[in-house]
Protein backbone atom coordinates (compact mmCIF):
# COMPACT_ATOMS: atom_id res chain seq x y z
CA UNK A 1 0.00 0.00 0.00
CA UNK A 2 1.27 3.43 -0.88
CA UNK A 3 1.84 5.90 1.92
CA UNK A 4 -1.18 8.04 1.08
CA UNK A 5 -4.20 5.95 1.92
CA UNK A 6 -6.53 5.63 -1.08
CA UNK A 7 -10.32 5.86 -0.83
CA UNK A 8 -11.93 2.45 -0.42
CA UNK A 9 -15.42 1.32 -1.39
CA UNK A 10 -17.39 -1.76 -0.29
CA UNK A 11 -19.48 -4.25 -2.20
CA UNK A 12 -20.85 -7.71 -1.61
CA UNK A 13 -19.94 -10.44 -4.09
CA UNK A 14 -20.83 -14.10 -3.57
CA UNK A 15 -21.72 -13.47 0.08
CA UNK A 16 -18.32 -11.92 0.73
CA UNK A 17 -17.76 -8.24 1.49
CA UNK A 18 -15.02 -6.76 -0.70
CA UNK A 19 -13.48 -3.49 0.42
CA UNK A 20 -11.04 -2.22 -2.19
CA UNK A 21 -9.41 1.02 -3.35
CA UNK A 22 -11.40 2.99 -5.94
CA UNK A 23 -8.76 2.37 -8.59
CA UNK A 24 -10.08 -1.22 -8.89
CA UNK A 25 -13.39 -1.23 -10.76
CA UNK A 26 -15.80 -3.74 -12.35
CA UNK A 27 -15.11 -6.53 -9.87
CA UNK A 28 -16.48 -9.87 -11.00
CA UNK A 29 -16.00 -13.19 -9.18
CA UNK A 30 -13.82 -15.73 -11.01
CA UNK A 31 -13.42 -18.41 -8.39
CA UNK A 32 -12.82 -19.34 -4.81
CA UNK A 33 -10.88 -21.99 -2.96
CA UNK A 34 -9.92 -22.92 0.56
CA UNK A 35 -7.52 -19.99 0.90
CA UNK A 36 -9.53 -17.18 -0.60
CA UNK A 37 -11.76 -15.88 -3.35
CA UNK A 38 -10.67 -14.14 -6.53
CA UNK A 39 -12.29 -11.37 -8.56
CA UNK A 40 -11.30 -10.04 -11.95
CA UNK A 41 -11.11 -6.24 -11.95
CA UNK A 42 -10.04 -3.32 -14.10
CA UNK A 43 -7.18 -1.27 -12.67
CA UNK A 44 -7.97 2.30 -13.70
CA UNK A 45 -4.48 3.43 -12.73
CA UNK A 46 -2.61 1.16 -15.15
CA UNK A 47 -5.32 0.12 -17.59
CA UNK A 48 -4.58 -3.53 -16.79
CA UNK A 49 -7.03 -6.33 -16.14
CA UNK A 50 -6.04 -7.76 -12.77
CA UNK A 51 -6.93 -10.57 -10.41
CA UNK A 52 -7.71 -9.49 -6.84
CA UNK A 53 -7.52 -12.26 -4.26
CA UNK A 54 -9.10 -11.77 -0.86
CA UNK A 55 -7.50 -14.18 1.59
CA UNK A 56 -10.02 -16.13 3.60
CA UNK A 57 -9.58 -15.78 7.39
CA UNK A 58 -5.88 -14.99 7.02
CA UNK A 59 -5.21 -14.93 10.77
CA UNK A 60 -7.68 -17.46 12.17
CA UNK A 61 -4.94 -19.77 13.45
CA UNK A 62 -1.17 -19.87 13.72
CA UNK A 63 -1.04 -22.07 10.61
CA UNK A 64 -3.21 -19.62 8.64
CA UNK A 65 -1.23 -16.63 9.86
CA UNK A 66 2.10 -18.18 8.91
CA UNK A 67 0.72 -19.26 5.52
CA UNK A 68 -0.50 -15.70 4.88
CA UNK A 69 2.93 -14.31 5.74
CA UNK A 70 4.60 -16.97 3.55
CA UNK A 71 2.41 -16.23 0.54
CA UNK A 72 2.99 -12.48 0.77
CA UNK A 73 6.75 -12.86 1.24
CA UNK A 74 6.99 -15.26 -1.73
CA UNK A 75 4.90 -13.13 -4.07
CA UNK A 76 6.80 -9.97 -3.10
CA UNK A 77 10.09 -11.68 -3.89
CA UNK A 78 9.15 -13.00 -7.34
CA UNK A 79 10.27 -10.68 -10.13
CA UNK A 80 10.54 -12.70 -13.33
CA UNK A 81 8.68 -12.78 -16.65
CA UNK A 82 7.70 -16.43 -16.26
CA UNK A 83 6.58 -16.26 -12.62
CA UNK A 84 3.46 -14.58 -11.26
CA UNK A 85 4.42 -11.46 -9.34
CA UNK A 86 2.63 -9.01 -7.10
CA UNK A 87 1.19 -5.82 -8.62
CA UNK A 88 -0.32 -4.56 -5.36
CA UNK A 89 -1.24 -5.64 -1.84
CA UNK A 90 -3.67 -3.74 0.35
CA UNK A 91 -5.85 -3.82 3.44
CA UNK A 92 -8.72 -1.51 4.30
CA UNK A 93 -7.36 -1.40 7.87
CA UNK A 94 -5.87 1.91 9.01
CA UNK A 95 -3.71 0.36 11.74
CA UNK A 96 -2.31 -2.94 12.96
CA UNK A 97 -5.07 -3.02 15.60
CA UNK A 98 -7.84 -3.24 12.99
CA UNK A 99 -5.81 -5.31 10.49
CA UNK A 100 -7.78 -8.44 9.56
CA UNK A 101 -8.00 -8.64 5.77
CA UNK A 102 -5.35 -9.04 3.10
CA UNK A 103 -5.94 -8.53 -0.63
CA UNK A 104 -3.34 -9.53 -3.23
CA UNK A 105 -3.35 -8.15 -6.79
CA UNK A 106 -1.71 -9.99 -9.69
CA UNK A 107 -2.04 -10.04 -13.48
CA UNK A 108 -5.30 -11.54 -14.69
CA UNK A 109 -4.18 -14.52 -16.73
CA UNK A 110 -6.54 -15.86 -19.38
CA UNK A 111 -6.13 -19.54 -20.13
CA UNK A 112 -4.10 -22.17 -18.32
CA UNK A 113 -2.21 -25.03 -19.90
CA UNK A 114 -5.13 -27.36 -19.18
CA UNK A 115 -7.41 -25.38 -21.49
CA UNK A 116 -4.73 -25.31 -24.18
CA UNK A 117 -4.00 -29.06 -24.13
CA UNK A 118 -7.70 -29.92 -24.27
CA UNK A 119 -8.25 -27.72 -27.32
CA UNK A 120 -5.42 -28.83 -29.57
CA UNK A 121 -2.45 -31.11 -30.03
CA UNK A 122 0.54 -28.83 -29.93
CA UNK A 123 3.27 -28.57 -32.54
CA UNK A 124 6.80 -29.42 -31.45
CA UNK A 125 7.71 -25.74 -31.69
CA UNK A 126 4.90 -24.84 -29.28
CA UNK A 127 6.10 -27.51 -26.86
CA UNK A 128 9.67 -26.19 -27.06
CA UNK A 129 8.57 -22.63 -26.29
CA UNK A 130 6.20 -23.57 -23.45
CA UNK A 131 8.58 -25.97 -21.69
CA UNK A 132 11.48 -23.54 -22.18
CA UNK A 133 9.51 -20.86 -20.33
CA UNK A 134 8.56 -23.23 -17.49
CA UNK A 135 12.23 -24.15 -17.05
CA UNK A 136 13.31 -20.51 -17.28
CA UNK A 137 10.88 -19.66 -14.46
CA UNK A 138 11.98 -22.71 -12.45
CA UNK A 139 15.66 -21.84 -12.75
CA UNK A 140 14.78 -18.48 -11.16
CA UNK A 141 12.57 -19.98 -8.43
CA UNK A 142 15.10 -22.71 -7.59
CA UNK A 143 17.95 -20.20 -7.43
CA UNK A 144 16.12 -18.58 -4.50
CA UNK A 145 16.01 -22.00 -2.82
CA UNK A 146 12.27 -22.28 -3.33
CA UNK A 147 10.55 -25.47 -4.45
CA UNK A 148 7.19 -25.10 -6.17
CA UNK A 149 5.96 -28.61 -5.23
CA UNK A 150 2.71 -28.40 -7.17
CA UNK A 151 3.48 -27.83 -10.84
CA UNK A 152 0.61 -29.01 -13.04
CA UNK A 153 -1.11 -27.67 -16.16
CA UNK A 154 -3.72 -25.72 -14.18
CA UNK A 155 -0.90 -23.83 -12.39
CA UNK A 156 0.61 -22.60 -15.65
CA UNK A 157 -1.05 -19.54 -17.18
CA UNK A 158 -0.64 -18.87 -20.89
CA UNK A 159 -1.74 -15.84 -22.92
CA UNK A 160 -2.61 -15.53 -26.64
CA UNK A 161 1.06 -15.08 -27.53
CA UNK A 162 1.94 -18.36 -25.83
CA UNK A 163 3.71 -16.49 -23.03
CA UNK A 164 3.66 -18.46 -19.81
CA UNK A 165 3.72 -17.68 -16.09
CA UNK A 166 4.02 -20.13 -13.20
CA UNK A 167 1.25 -19.64 -10.60
CA UNK A 168 0.25 -20.91 -7.18
CA UNK A 169 3.34 -22.07 -5.37
CA UNK A 170 2.91 -25.12 -3.19
CA UNK A 171 2.40 -22.79 -0.27
CA UNK A 172 0.09 -25.01 1.68
CA UNK A 173 1.42 -28.50 1.88
CA UNK A 174 -1.32 -30.70 0.43
CA UNK A 175 -3.18 -32.90 2.87
CA UNK A 176 -3.30 -36.65 2.30
CA UNK A 177 -6.97 -36.24 1.60
CA UNK A 178 -6.41 -33.89 -1.35
CA UNK A 179 -3.92 -36.37 -2.80
CA UNK A 180 -6.28 -39.35 -2.66
CA UNK A 181 -8.02 -40.93 -5.64
CA UNK A 182 -8.10 -40.02 -9.32
CA UNK A 183 -6.77 -36.47 -8.89
CA UNK A 184 -4.53 -34.24 -10.98
CA UNK A 185 -2.94 -32.96 -7.78
CA UNK A 186 -1.08 -36.25 -7.68
CA UNK A 187 -0.56 -37.16 -11.36
CA UNK A 188 2.32 -34.71 -11.73
CA UNK A 189 3.92 -35.42 -8.36
CA UNK A 190 7.39 -36.89 -8.10
CA UNK A 191 7.27 -40.38 -6.57
CA UNK A 192 9.52 -39.39 -3.66
CA UNK A 193 7.01 -36.72 -2.52
CA UNK A 194 3.92 -38.78 -3.23
CA UNK A 195 5.18 -41.73 -1.22
CA UNK A 196 7.27 -39.91 1.40
CA UNK A 197 10.38 -41.82 0.42
CA UNK A 198 12.97 -39.36 1.64
CA UNK A 199 13.86 -35.71 2.01
CA UNK A 200 13.18 -34.30 -1.40
CA UNK A 201 14.95 -31.57 -3.35
CA UNK A 202 14.19 -29.09 -6.13
CA UNK A 203 14.15 -31.76 -8.82
CA UNK A 204 10.65 -32.76 -7.67
CA UNK A 205 9.61 -29.87 -9.91
CA UNK A 206 11.60 -31.29 -12.83
CA UNK A 207 9.67 -34.57 -12.58
CA UNK A 208 6.48 -32.54 -12.88
CA UNK A 209 7.83 -30.73 -15.97
CA UNK A 210 8.57 -34.13 -17.54
CA UNK A 211 4.97 -35.23 -16.94
CA UNK A 212 3.65 -31.96 -18.39
CA UNK A 213 5.94 -32.12 -21.43
CA UNK A 214 4.91 -35.70 -22.19
CA UNK A 215 1.27 -34.61 -22.02
CA UNK A 216 1.86 -31.70 -24.40
CA UNK A 217 3.54 -34.05 -26.89
CA UNK A 218 0.88 -36.79 -26.76
CA UNK A 219 -2.31 -35.03 -25.65
CA UNK A 220 -2.70 -37.57 -22.83
CA UNK A 221 -1.89 -37.57 -19.11
CA UNK A 222 1.30 -39.57 -18.64
CA UNK A 223 0.53 -41.17 -15.25
CA UNK A 224 -3.24 -40.90 -14.55
CA UNK A 225 -3.14 -43.15 -11.48
CA UNK A 226 -6.38 -44.01 -9.71
CA UNK A 227 -4.56 -44.00 -6.34
CA UNK A 228 -1.00 -43.85 -4.95
CA UNK A 229 -0.24 -47.50 -5.65
CA UNK A 230 -1.70 -47.50 -9.16
CA UNK A 231 0.25 -44.33 -9.86
CA UNK A 232 3.52 -45.91 -8.72
CA UNK A 233 2.85 -48.92 -10.95
CA UNK A 234 2.29 -46.68 -13.98
CA UNK A 235 5.52 -44.82 -13.21
CA UNK A 236 7.61 -47.97 -12.71
CA UNK A 237 6.20 -49.53 -15.89
CA UNK A 238 7.77 -46.63 -17.84
CA UNK A 239 10.99 -45.92 -15.93
CA UNK A 240 11.68 -49.40 -14.52
CA UNK A 241 11.93 -50.60 -10.93
CA UNK A 242 14.61 -48.96 -8.77
CA UNK A 243 18.04 -50.53 -8.52
CA UNK A 244 19.93 -51.25 -5.31
CA UNK A 245 21.65 -47.83 -5.26
CA UNK A 246 18.32 -45.97 -5.22
CA UNK A 247 16.70 -48.39 -2.75
CA UNK A 248 19.50 -47.55 -0.29
CA UNK A 249 18.47 -43.87 -0.44
CA UNK A 250 14.82 -44.51 0.43
CA UNK A 251 14.66 -43.79 4.14
CA UNK A 252 11.21 -45.30 4.65
CA UNK A 253 11.59 -49.00 5.43
CA UNK A 254 8.00 -49.81 4.50
CA UNK A 255 8.45 -48.12 1.11
CA UNK A 256 11.66 -50.11 0.51
CA UNK A 257 9.98 -53.38 1.40
CA UNK A 258 7.00 -52.65 -0.82
CA UNK A 259 9.18 -51.81 -3.83
CA UNK A 260 11.27 -54.94 -3.31
CA UNK A 261 8.10 -57.02 -3.36
CA UNK A 262 7.22 -55.83 -6.88
CA UNK A 263 8.11 -57.72 -10.04
CA UNK A 264 11.32 -56.30 -11.51
CA UNK A 265 10.63 -54.23 -14.64
CA UNK A 266 13.16 -52.78 -17.07
CA UNK A 267 12.97 -49.14 -18.19
CA UNK A 268 11.02 -48.84 -21.42
CA UNK A 269 12.57 -47.40 -24.55
CA UNK A 270 11.14 -43.87 -24.57
CA UNK A 271 11.45 -43.68 -28.37
CA UNK A 272 8.88 -46.49 -28.59
CA UNK A 273 6.58 -44.75 -26.11
CA UNK A 274 6.71 -41.27 -27.68
CA UNK A 275 6.52 -42.35 -31.30
CA UNK A 276 6.82 -39.49 -33.76
CA UNK A 277 8.19 -37.04 -31.20
CA UNK A 278 11.33 -35.01 -31.88
CA UNK A 279 14.25 -37.24 -30.77
CA UNK A 280 15.69 -34.31 -28.79
CA UNK A 281 12.39 -34.02 -26.90
CA UNK A 282 12.56 -37.73 -26.10
CA UNK A 283 16.16 -37.37 -24.91
CA UNK A 284 15.18 -34.52 -22.58
CA UNK A 285 12.22 -36.51 -21.20
CA UNK A 286 14.61 -39.37 -20.39
CA UNK A 287 16.74 -36.95 -18.36
CA UNK A 288 13.74 -35.50 -16.47
CA UNK A 289 11.78 -38.66 -15.71
CA UNK A 290 14.55 -40.32 -13.71
CA UNK A 291 13.47 -42.11 -10.55
CA UNK A 292 16.62 -41.17 -8.64
CA UNK A 293 16.24 -37.45 -7.93
CA UNK A 294 20.02 -37.06 -7.54
CA UNK A 295 20.39 -38.04 -11.21
CA UNK A 296 17.55 -35.89 -12.57
CA UNK A 297 18.55 -32.94 -14.76
CA UNK A 298 18.28 -29.50 -13.11
CA UNK A 299 16.37 -26.55 -14.58
CA UNK A 300 19.60 -24.72 -15.45
CA UNK A 301 21.03 -27.83 -17.16
CA UNK A 302 17.78 -28.47 -19.03
CA UNK A 303 17.76 -24.92 -20.46
CA UNK A 304 21.09 -25.72 -22.13
CA UNK A 305 19.73 -28.94 -23.69
CA UNK A 306 19.81 -29.06 -27.50
CA UNK A 307 16.00 -29.27 -27.62
CA UNK A 308 15.87 -25.54 -26.72
CA UNK A 309 18.63 -24.43 -29.09
CA UNK A 310 16.43 -21.78 -30.75
CA UNK A 311 15.38 -20.23 -27.42
CA UNK A 312 18.31 -20.72 -25.04
CA UNK A 313 20.16 -17.52 -24.15
CA UNK A 314 22.43 -17.88 -21.10
CA UNK A 315 22.47 -14.08 -20.71
CA UNK A 316 18.68 -13.90 -20.48
CA UNK A 317 17.92 -16.66 -17.97
CA UNK A 318 18.22 -14.71 -14.72
CA UNK A 319 18.50 -15.97 -11.17
CA UNK A 320 16.77 -14.51 -8.12
CA UNK A 321 18.06 -12.32 -5.34
CA UNK A 322 18.68 -14.36 -2.17
CA UNK A 323 15.43 -15.12 -0.35
CA UNK A 324 15.48 -15.21 3.44
CA UNK A 325 13.32 -18.11 4.61
CA UNK A 326 14.61 -18.24 8.17
CA UNK A 327 11.03 -17.45 9.29
CA UNK A 328 10.00 -21.00 8.29
CA UNK A 329 11.62 -22.44 11.41
CA UNK A 330 10.15 -19.81 13.76
CA UNK A 331 7.34 -20.61 16.18
CA UNK A 332 5.42 -17.40 16.71
CA UNK A 333 2.01 -16.42 18.03
CA UNK A 334 -0.82 -15.35 15.72
CA UNK A 335 -0.34 -11.68 16.61
CA UNK A 336 3.37 -11.88 15.83
CA UNK A 337 2.77 -13.37 12.34
CA UNK A 338 0.06 -10.75 11.87
CA UNK A 339 2.39 -7.91 12.79
CA UNK A 340 5.10 -9.21 10.43
CA UNK A 341 2.49 -9.48 7.66
CA UNK A 342 1.27 -5.93 8.32
CA UNK A 343 4.85 -4.66 7.97
CA UNK A 344 5.12 -6.43 4.59
CA UNK A 345 1.85 -4.88 3.39
CA UNK A 346 2.86 -1.38 4.45
CA UNK A 347 6.37 -1.65 2.98
CA UNK A 348 5.20 -2.89 -0.45
CA UNK A 349 6.56 -0.91 -3.40
CA UNK A 350 4.70 -1.55 -6.69
CA UNK A 351 6.76 -2.81 -9.63
CA UNK A 352 7.67 -0.30 -12.37
CA UNK A 353 5.06 -0.37 -15.14
CA UNK A 354 6.03 -2.28 -18.22
CA UNK A 355 5.33 -0.18 -21.34
CA UNK A 356 4.45 -3.23 -23.43
CA UNK A 357 1.82 -4.28 -20.91
CA UNK A 358 0.20 -0.87 -20.87
CA UNK A 359 -0.08 -0.84 -24.65
CA UNK A 360 -1.45 -4.36 -24.93
UniProtKB/Swiss-Prot annotation:
Its main location: cytoplasm. Its EC number is 2.7.11.24. ATP binds at residues 30-38, 53. The modification N-acetylserine is found at residue 2. Activated by cell stresses such as DNA damage, heat shock, osmotic shock, anisomycin and sodium arsenite, as well as pro-inflammatory stimuli such as bacterial lipopolysaccharide (LPS) and interleukin-1. Activation occurs through dual phosphorylation of Thr-180 and Tyr-182 by either of two dual specificity kinases, MAP2K3/MKK3 or MAP2K6/MKK6, and potentially also MAP2K4/MKK4, as well as by TAB1-mediated autophosphorylation. Component of a signaling complex containing at least AKAP13, PKN1, MAPK14, ZAK and MAP2K3. Within this complex, AKAP13 interacts directly with PKN1, which in turn recruits MAPK14, MAP2K3 and ZAK. Binds to a kinase interaction motif within the protein tyrosine phosphatase, PTPRR. This interaction retains MAPK14 in the cytoplasm and prevents nuclear accumulation. Interacts with SPAG9 and GADD45A. Interacts with CDC25B, CDC25C, DUSP1, DUSP10, DUSP16, NP60, SUPT20H and TAB1. Interacts with casein kinase II subunits CSNK2A1 and CSNK2B. Interacts with PPM1D. This is Mitogen-activated protein kinase 14. The gene is MAPK14.
Amino acid sequence: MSQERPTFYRQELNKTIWEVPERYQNLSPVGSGAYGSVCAAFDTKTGLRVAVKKLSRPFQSIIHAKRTYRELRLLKHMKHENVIGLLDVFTPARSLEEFNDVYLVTHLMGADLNNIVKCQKLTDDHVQFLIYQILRGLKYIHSADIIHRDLKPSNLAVNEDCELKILDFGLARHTDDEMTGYVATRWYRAPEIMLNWMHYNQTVDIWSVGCIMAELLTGRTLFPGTDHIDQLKLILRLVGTPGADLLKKISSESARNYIQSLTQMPKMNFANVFIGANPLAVDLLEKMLVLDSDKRITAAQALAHAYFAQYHDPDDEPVADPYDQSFESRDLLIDEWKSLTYDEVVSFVPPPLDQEEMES
